[in-house]
């Protein structure tokens, strides 16, 4: 059992028969009332993100999640196909469970699958990934005041805002949690 007061990002727990991972947790106390915990959590079975509220001190069951490295092969539209790098066994995960993560996946990338007992739930990416810029408009002269940004397209099809100096063909570091530009990758 785990106390909701100890919630922090990355903690996995079971509630109402579903498995959740904490993305954010906010603790609040008002006057003489009881403390409350509001947690932004991801349902690992459905892939949906919800806000759950708990009265402080409530206990929930800890979910022991096994993580195993696998290589991303491809997506067939309905499922993503991953291969165990040791046994060469292939597994499928519904695209609906990994829609956000698909923005950062490229062929051959090593990811971790999350398993609860024998049930494969979803995948976990590194906090940051290096991806190549495939489309980047030229910087417009005179449009350089107040931290100018431009929208670029990555090799995975994901679009994000980057500084004006980023050009096509460059490799950049992107946060998989926020989808934001982190910096240039070392060449």
Curated annotation (Swiss-Prot):
One of its GO terms (biological process) is peptide biosynthetic process. GO terms for molecular function: translation elongation factor activity. It holds the Pfam family EFP_N. One of its GO terms (cellular component) is cytoplasm. CDD domains: S1_EF-P_repeat_1 (cd04470). Pathway: Protein biosynthesis; polypeptide chain elongation. The gene is efp. This is Elongation factor P. Belongs to the elongation factor P family.
């Amino acid at each position: 059992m785990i106390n909701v007061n100890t919630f922090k990002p990355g903690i996995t727990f079971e509630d109402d028969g579903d498995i959740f991972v904490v993305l954010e947790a906010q603790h609040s106390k008002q006057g003489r009332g009881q403390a409350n915990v509001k947690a932004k959590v991801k349902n690992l079975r459905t892939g949906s993100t919800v806000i759950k509220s708990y009265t402080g001190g409530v206990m929930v069951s800890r979910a022991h999640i096994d993580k195993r490295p696998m290589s991303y092969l491809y997506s067939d539209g309905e499922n993503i196909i991953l291969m165990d790098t040791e046994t060469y066994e292939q597994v499928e995960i519904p695209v609906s469970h990994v829609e956000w993560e698909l923005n950062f996946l490229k062929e051959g990338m090593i990811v971790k699958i999350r398993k609860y007992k024998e049930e494969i739930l979803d995948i976990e990416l590194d906090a940051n990934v290096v991806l190549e810029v495939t489309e980047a408009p030229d910087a417009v002269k005179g449009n350089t005041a107040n931290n100018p940004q431009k929208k670029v397209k990555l090799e995975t099809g994901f679009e994000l805002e980057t500084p004006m100096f980023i050009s096509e063909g460059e490799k950049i570091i992107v946060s998989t949690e926020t989808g934001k530009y982190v910096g240039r990758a070392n060449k």
